Regions:
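Short, well-structured N-terminal submotif of metal-dependent ribonuclease cores
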Residues: 1-40, 53-66
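Acidic, PIN/NYN-like endoribonuclease modules and their adjacent C-terminal/linker elements
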Residues: 1-3, 103-133
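Histidine- and aromatic-rich ligand-binding microenvironments
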Residues: 6-7, 40-42, 94-96, 117, ...
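A generic structural signal for short hydrophobic patches within well-formed alpha-helices
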Residues: 11-12, 45, 120-121
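Anion (oxyanion) recognition and catalysis
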Residues: 32, 69, 107
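Helix-loop "lid/cap" segments that line or gate small-molecule binding pockets
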Residues: 48-54, 72
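Active-site neighborhoods of divalent-metal-dependent phosphate/nucleic-acid chemistry enzymes
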Residues: 74-112
Length: 133
């Protein structure tokens, strides 16, 4: 199982039961069985929260947060080193700062980035992307 980094798109699709969330569910199940967590930045966590609260409401977020605790996801803070790489991405690519942190973490970990967000096409030559549909 390759090392994987989740973008906000992936986790939101998972929580909303969207078709793109099915491979995320499978990935999380494999990660749990292998005792090998997937990775996500705290910046992406914040993006997931505000997007769910904004569109689906605070109660939906509270339920999602309870589920999130049990998922095999290791959250990474925005260290200075990670911020440097994220800033380099953000200076060149028109995507959110949280997306820049996801790309930076994937680069740092030499991991695949799991996303369906087309804005990442701009960096697919620099990092491996597992495209969700």
């Amino acid at each position: 199982m390759p090392t994987s980094v989740l973008d906000s798109f992936a986790l939101i699709a998972y929580f909303r039961g969207e078709p793109a969330g099915a491979p995320v569910k499978e990935l999380l199940q494999k990660a749990s069985k292998a005792d090998k967590p997937v990775h996500m930045t705290e910046a992406n966590y914040a993006e997931v929260k505000y997007m769910i609260v904004r569109k689906d409401g605070a109660e939906t977020w509270r339920e999602a947060a309870k589920i999130l605790i049990a998922l095999p996801i290791e959250f990474h803070p925005a260290t200075r080193e990670l911020a440097e790489v994220a800033a380099d991405f953000k200076s060149r690519v028109s995507f959110s700062l949280a997306d820049a942190f996801a790309a930076a973490l994937a680069k740092e970990k030499k991991a695949e980035l799991v996303t369906g967000d087309p804005e990442f096409k701009a960096v697919e030559k620099e990092i491996k992307i597992n495209w969700l549909k």
